[in-house]
Every structure is written in C-alpha cells, then in structure tokens.
C-alpha cells in the first residue's frame, strides 16, 4: 500500500474520509467549517482515520520526504488562503498556466524534466494545487514519473472539488481527443477547502455548478431540487454543504466501480457531446470552458432522454431540467460561449463523438436519464437522433 511519508499530527475536530481503491489508500481531508461535521463515510481501514490539520502537517512538522508543488500560475498574483502560505514558502514550486492547452505531452515533459532537475525520487511527494486541468496534468505526471510518486491533490475550483480531483482519473489530450492518454491512479490525499472558492471568478463557479448539477441529475433528486432554487453566484450559498453532497455522490459510485466498467459511466452524462464541443473549440482556437461544454452536452442529452421516455411526466421533468440548465448557462455567462456552442453543426461534432474513449466498436454510447436521479449507461445514440435532439434543444 502506498502512503505519503509525512508524519500525521493529530488534532481535534478535523475528520478525514478514507477512500480505498486497488491497494492504494486515499484520504479526503476536510478543513474547518461545516465540512468538519462530515460523518466518517467509510469504515474500511479504521486504523488510518486520523484527525489533523493538513496545512499544519506540512508547515509545523519535520517532513520525512521531500515535497514539491505544482500550482496554477494564477496564484502567482491571486491571494492564497493563509493556511497554505508557509507551504509555498518552504517548497520548490512549478507554475502551470491552467486550461485545456496545459493538458499536453509537451507540458507533461516539462514537469518530468523539472522533477528530474530537482532530483525528485519515487519516495517524494508531489502536491498539486489548482483546478481540474492542473490536477489532471499533475496527477498524470505523478502517476508516470519513476512509475509513480505519492501525490496530494488540493483542488481550488468548485469543479475540482466536486468532480475532477475525486475518483483517480487523470489524463492529457492527444490528437484533439480529450483525455486520450491517462491513468487510473488514486492520490494519497485529497484536501477540500472551500475557502479557495473566494478566489474564483464568476465563470469558474458556473463551471463547477455544471458538474455539481450533473451529479444531482444522475444520482440525487433532492439535491437537484435544492440547486433549482439557487444560482451559482448567490452570496449566501452554503458551499460546504453543496460540496459535501456533490462529492459524496461521486464517491459512492466510484467505490463500487473504480475502473469505470459499469455504473461509474453515468458520471459521463453530458460529456460525450461536451468533449466533442471542446475538441471543435480547440481546433478553431475558440475559448470554451469544460463545465460550460458539459452543460450544453447535458441539455442535449436531456432532450434525447425525454424523446426516449415512455412516461409523460418523465418527459416533462427531463425537459424542465434541460430548461433549467439553459437558464443558468444563459444568465450566468456572457453570450459568446452560448452563441458559439449552439451555432455548431451537429454533423461536425459527430466525428469527435465517434472517437470518444467510452465507445465500443462503431457505436456512440451515451447516458440516458430515465428520470431525475436515475440513469442508464451504454445507450446507443444514432447520428440522426443526435441531429434531431440538437435541433430541438436550441
């Protein structure tokens, strides 16, 4: 079993959630606030349930292994939560310009070279701080350098906290295909601290809101109803509560299907179409955020699910959900990404959907919602049906 070689400092009221997958142990650390009320959701590995301050662990103790930091370059100028400032002062840091462009072999090679230059060994620890693209890249590098370094993920975006950092997936893009090269490797720890959300611009909250909505749509009808009464930029949102709910949905699913052979596939809801949009955007050099693309993908997939539904009430419920997503995307973002996305020709998206890594043979497989909170995976989507529901959606 791989473990981070950093001493644990026991403190009160600082629970962690253990995740145990394929002989690799990960801990989900919950800093102070409402998240400190997390119940211990897993009873495996009880001897590893420590209570401690993740920041103090690094700054107040003698570290047995070297630790190196990969961080989103935005934090060279943005304020960093005070608890983490000493970590930066004591560490060698490699700054990464976040965004889909960073998920490339070239950027991975640059970090491998940096790790070689600083003499990192396989017993050292890589601490990866940033949003989804930064943690995707950093985790891929960590999982491959010298056959695997210990690594800690500290997601700083809502998207990272509820989705990207959880589940052991990492990857880079290749030949225009999203996440074409990557591994399933669990981090040693995941530290979720919603104080990072104070650093986010409006559009980044919307990105994470789309992934949070996805979790609710495929797995929690009550959470979906709660989200329907909110907007991502409400000033009084209880982020601790929502992050807990969203991350718990994903955690429960991946416990039973870590390598995505079955139920975990439902977490790809909206992603087949969303990834195709991102690929077209990359080719045309059009800025398009992942969460926004997934939101558009979910709108279309909900229309498809409504088209296939036998029950009239389910049809109505699914179309209402599609309209709710549309409302958020239109109201919470500027018009450019919406106008660009909805003006795309579905026949130009189809070749990228055919190359999606989730497909088998020549079929495009998508996720169909039977109702809110209930999803089926590996559902064949025909090109004519896709073009029809794309038109109906917009």
Locate the predicted segments by residue.
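ATP/NTP phosphate-donor binding region
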Residues: 40-125
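Short glycine/serine/threonine-rich phosphate/pyrophosphate-binding segments
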Residues: 133-140, 276
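C-terminal charged capping/lid subdomain of soluble metabolic enzymes
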Residues: 210-212, 312-394
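Glycine-rich beta-strand-to-loop/alpha-helix junction loops that act as flexible
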Residues: 98-99, 129-131, 269-270
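Short, positively charged low-complexity motifs
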Residues: 1-9, 13-14, 23-40
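A glycine/threonine-rich phosphate-anchoring loop and its flanking beta-alpha core
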Residues: 140-232
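Active-site segments that bind and position negatively charged phosphate/pyrophosphate groups
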Residues: 226-347
